[in-house]
C-alpha cells in the first residue's frame, strides 16, 4: 500500500492511499484488506482511496474530502461530491466538499 499513489497520514492516525490514475486505482483495489475502508466518488470519475488503521469518523470524512478534491469536476454540478465508503459489508454514503489544498498539505507522505 505504501508504494501506490498519493499517501496521506490523517490527523487521527489513519493512512490513506489514493490512486492518481486508473492503473493505481486498480492496484489499490487488489490491496484492500478486510479492515480497510474503500472510498470513491459515487457519480463521477476519480481516485480510489484506501483508508487503513482508522475507524474514526473524522478520518473517514477527511478521506472523503480528499477524494472529492481529486475527483473530476462537473462544470454545471454542485461543489459537493457524493461519496461511498465501504468496509466489508458496511457501506456509508454521504456528500463531501473538496478539501482546500492548504488544509491537507502537512498530511502528505
Please state what every model-predicted region is.
Residues 70-109:
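Helix-rich interaction surfaces within compact, conserved domain-sized segments
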Residues 1-50, 55-57, 67-75:
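Nucleotide-activated chemistry modules centered on ATP-dependent adenylation/adenylyltransferase
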Residues 58-62:
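Acyl-donor binding region in acyl/amide transferases
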Amino acid at each position: 500500500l505504501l508504494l501506490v499513489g498519493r499517501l496521506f497520514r490523517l490527523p487521527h492516525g489513519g493512512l490513506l492511499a489514493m490512486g492518481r490514475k486508473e492503473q493505481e486505482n486498480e492496484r489499490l483495489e487488489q490491496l484492500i484488506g478486510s479492515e480497510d475502508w474503500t472510498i470513491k466518488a459515487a457519480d463521477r470519475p476519480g481516485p480510489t482511496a484506501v483508508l487503513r488503521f482508522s475507524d474514526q469518523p473524522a478520518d473517514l470524512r477527511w478521506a472523503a474530502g480528499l477524494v472529492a478534491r481529486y475527483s473530476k469536476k462537473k462544470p454545471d454540478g454542485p461543489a459537493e461530491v457524493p461519496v461511498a465508503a465501504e468496509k466489508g459489508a458496511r457501506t456509508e454514503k454521504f456528500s463531501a466538499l473538496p478539501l482546500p489544498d492548504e488544509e491537507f498539505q502537512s498530511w502528505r507522505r
